[in-house]
Regions:
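Short, well-structured N-terminal submotif of metal-dependent ribonuclease cores
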Residues: 1-28, 41-55, 124
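Active-site neighborhoods of divalent-metal-dependent phosphate/nucleic-acid chemistry enzymes
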Residues: 62-105
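Acidic, PIN/NYN-like endoribonuclease modules and their adjacent C-terminal/linker elements
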Residues: 95-96, 100-124
């Protein structure tokens, strides 16, 4: 959703609006927030990066899960399980958190989630 030039912008916008309309609870991890901040900072600058953080924090629809030591241990197991696939630690923590919360769908375009056995939610 950061950039209208992103190949998935229109679909991401539609999916987020659909999730909000249906009152589907959304959650993410602080590591995904960190990745979002870094990408926005380097692509759009300080103001845009701060605005992105503010919008996420202000959203009543998004819960931020802060990674724990247990999440870290589970993420390491995910990285080992998915080897040799190049999976980021942030994604592995997401897998661990999704697994511990019995969440099998993700609003993402990242095929690493499919490789880990999760479904990409498409609003249906």
């Amino acid at each position: 959703l950061r950039s209208r030039r992103d190949q998935h912008h229109a679909d991401a916008d539609r999916l987020f609006r659909t999730a909000l309309e249906r009152r589907i609870p959304l959650f993410t991890t602080n590591l995904i927030i960190a990745e979002t901040h870094r990408l926005t900072l380097h692509r759009a600058g300080v103001q845009s990066a701060l605005k992105a953080l503010d919008r996420i924090a202000a959203s009543a629809s998004v819960t931020i899960h802060f990674a724990t030591a247990d999440d870290h241990s589970a993420a390491l197991r995910w990285l080992e399980r998915l080897r040799p696939r190049p999976t980021t630690y942030a994604d592995a923590v997401s897998f661990a958190v999704m697994e511990s919360n019995s969440c099998n769908q993700v609003l993402s375009f990242d095929e690493d989630f499919v490789a880990a056995g999760f479904s990409l939610w498409r609003g249906r």
